[in-house]
């Protein structure tokens, strides 16, 4: 099979040689897979390209504010097409399996039939794209499945099991990574908040009885048994927990206790923002698309732009028999809280978006945001994932509207600064360990739950530079933090002496005199939003990447806006 991206004709005709001898129903499901893959890919590109812009996604997915023109129509049309194509596959579960695509031919937890040999990688890729899209669209309230589905299929989407055919043993295919555990923890938290939405009134006081009922449902006491049984098929032996699973259970216990003491609904939504969760979810998908779809890291390739069978993990072929609850016909809910979660919908930013985000209410801003977002989407769809930076630069040079993130910069609170200082004193500049102590489900507090490793390093480095510039004695906890004035000054001097640097700056200022300040602000905001987790060997996209020197891209005045 050709390892490159097939052209349209090749993609649509890939099954022509085998379908003639198949039943009519099977022919329909197999032939429709190419269309399902195409629609899923376009929708995933729309969402992933705007991962850091929650207002843009809110505009695209808001069915009640349908624009008469613009690219929201394109997005909503694609969503409708996705729903229609999904109806071709007679499945009682929201997730597709190989049995839905090839009924009577390919059964879950079984090798592909001979007639489909050579096509299995494409089939699994299309199924996984569709299932991931189902998860994301449900999260964005475009599909009405609710939080019960999101909780139950999270592990099936991001780290499915593998049934090793031949010896009837179960092996772990997708490792339960720390970044996945934090996402799962935050998803459970958002499900808890959605269950309490009825208390969003004048008093905002949460009922203790309702709180306890939801906590018992979402953070069950037998969570360890559930994880072990899912992975091994056996229950009762929690000693079989992997280190990452054990860490997740401990984080859930701590998060449960922290949620239990919050009495005010508004305080809950401010501490655990829905928009922040969506940003982190889409950012993880963007950085780990190869792992989610192909079962292994794509070595610089993305399934949204490339189809390479050499990147595909063969073991993924047998991880298609996910045991999901059949939500469509399930009428035996164990409790009222469980019944509520099956219908509870994500809040779609309505109560979680900061008050400074007003673009979705302003038609002019809305139109410019959507136009810029989809312009980036269209240019990337034809050029591949590595051309987004160049396309963005070209659009700015041509004077077109740039894609700016319409969110206010998150100011460091006193509690966050104190937690960072304590973390530096305890473990030094080990940012992952600091987040283990003070991050999501932290062992001490969760004061840094909304901060990334890059942001911690930025903040500590700016503190150190402030002390060095003022001549004050440097605290012991900042001594090992990287950064010194000499390297900063050398970097500035090198830039000022570089050819054409002043000319380029003057040209940019003359062409866009009103955008100079906003460009600096956007750069800093991007650095704040970059995720510094050690996720899946992706290239570092922050200020302090593994391959960058101490002075690369650093702004010594960053602290002024922090």
From Swiss-Prot:
Species assigned in the record: Saccharomyces cerevisiae (strain ATCC 204508 / S288c)
Keyword set, alphabetical order: Cell cycle, Chromosome, DNA-binding, Nucleus, Telomere, Transcription, Transcription regulation
Note: Present with 6380 molecules/cell in log phase SD medium.
Compositionally biased region (Low complexity): 377-400
Comp. bias regions, Polar residues: 496-522, 532-552
Function as written in the Swiss-Prot or TrEMBL entry: Binds the telomeric double-stranded TTAGGG repeat and negatively regulates telomere length. Involved in the regulation of gene expression. 52 binding sites have been identified, distributed over 15 chromosomes. A member of the general regulatory factors (GRFs) which act as genome partitioners. Acts as a chromatin insulator which are known as STARs (Subtelomeric anti-silencing region). STARs prevent negative or positive transcription influence by extending across chromatin to a promoter.
Subcellular localization(s) per the UniProt record: Nucleus; Chromosome, Telomere
Entry GO MF terms: chromatin insulator sequence binding; DNA-binding transcription factor activity, RNA polymerase II-specific; double-stranded telomeric DNA binding; protein homodimerization activity; RNA polymerase II cis-regulatory region sequence-specific DNA binding; telomeric DNA binding
Name this polypeptide is given: Protein TBF1
PANTHER family: PROTEIN TBF1 (PTHR47807:SF1)
Quaternary state and interactors: Homodimer.
Any one of the GO CC terms: nucleus
DNA-binding stretch(es), residue numbering of this chain: 431-456
Region named Disordered: 376-414, 495-562
Biological process terms in GO annotation: chromatin remodeling; negative regulation of telomere maintenance via telomerase; snoRNA transcription by RNA polymerase II; telomere maintenance via telomere lengthening
């Amino acid at each position: 099979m050709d390892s490159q991206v097939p052209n349209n004709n090749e993609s649509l005709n890939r099954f022509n040689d085998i379908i003639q001898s198949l039943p009519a129903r099977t022919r329909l499901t197999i032939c429709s897979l190419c269309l399902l893959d195409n629609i899923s890919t376009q929708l995933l590109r729309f969402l992933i390209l705007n991962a850091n812009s929650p207002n843009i996604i809110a505009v695209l997915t808001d069915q009640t504010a349908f624009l008469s023109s613009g690219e929201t129509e394109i997005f909503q049309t694609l969503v409708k097409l996705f729903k229609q194509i999904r109806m071709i596959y007679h499945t009682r579960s929201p997730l597709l399996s190989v049995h839905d695509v090839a009924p009577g031919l390919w059964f879950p937890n079984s090798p592909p039939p001979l007639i489909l040999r050579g096509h299995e990688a494409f089939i699994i890729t299309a199924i996984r794209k569709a299932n991931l899209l189902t998860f994301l669209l449900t999260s964005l309230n475009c599909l009405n499945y609710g939080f019960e589905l999101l909780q139950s299929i999270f592990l099936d989407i991001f780290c499915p099991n593998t049934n090793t055919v031949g010896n009837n043993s179960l092996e772990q295919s997708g490792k339960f990574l720390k970044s996945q555990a934090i996402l799962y923890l935050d998803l459970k938290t958002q499900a808890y908040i959605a269950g309490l939405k009825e208390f969003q009134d004048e008093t905002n006081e949460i009922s203790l009885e309702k709180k306890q009922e939801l906590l018992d449902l979402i953070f069950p006491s037998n969570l360890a048994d559930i994880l072990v049984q899912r992975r091994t098929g056996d229950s009762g032996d929690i000693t079989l927990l992997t280190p990452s699973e054990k860490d997740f259970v401990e984080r859930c216990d701590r998060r449960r206790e922290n949620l239990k003491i919050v009495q005010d609904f508004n305080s809950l939504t401010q501490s655990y923002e829905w928009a922040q969760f969506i940003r982190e979810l889409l950012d993880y998908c963007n950085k780990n698309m190869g792992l989610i779809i192909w079962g292994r890291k794509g070595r610089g390739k993305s399934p949204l732009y490339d189809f390479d069978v050499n990147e595909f993990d063969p073991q993924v072929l047998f991880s298609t028999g996910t045991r999901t609850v059949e939500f469509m016909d399930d009428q035996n809910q164990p409790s009222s809280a469980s019944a509520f979660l099956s219908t509870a919908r994500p809040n779609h930013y309505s109560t979680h978006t900061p008050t400074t985000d007003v673009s979705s209410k302003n038609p002019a801003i809305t139109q410019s945001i959507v136009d810029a977002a989809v312009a980036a989407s269209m240019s990337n769809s034809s050029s591949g994932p590595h051309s987004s930076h160049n396309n963005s630069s070209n659009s700015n040079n041509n004077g077109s509207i740039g894609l700016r993130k319409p969110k206010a910069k998150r100011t460091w609170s006193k509690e966050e600064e104190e937690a960072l200082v304590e973390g530096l004193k305890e473990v030094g500049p080990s940012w992952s360990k600091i987040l283990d102590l003070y991050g999501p489900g932290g062992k001490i507090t969760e004061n840094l739950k909304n901060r990334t490793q890059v942001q911690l390093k930025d903040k500590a480095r700016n503190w150190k530079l402030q002390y060095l510039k003022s001549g004050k004695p440097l605290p012991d906890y900042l001594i090992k933090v990287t950064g010194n004035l000499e390297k900063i000054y050398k970097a500035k001097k090198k830039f000022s002496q570089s050819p054409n640097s002043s000319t380029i700056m003057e040209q940019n200022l003359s062409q866009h005199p009103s955008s100079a300040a906003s460009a600096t602000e956007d750069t800093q905001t991007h650095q704040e939003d970059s995720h510094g987790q050690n996720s899946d060997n992706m290239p570092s996209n922050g200020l302090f990447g593994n391959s960058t020197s101490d002075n690369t891209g650093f702004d010594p005045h960053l602290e002024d806006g922090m």
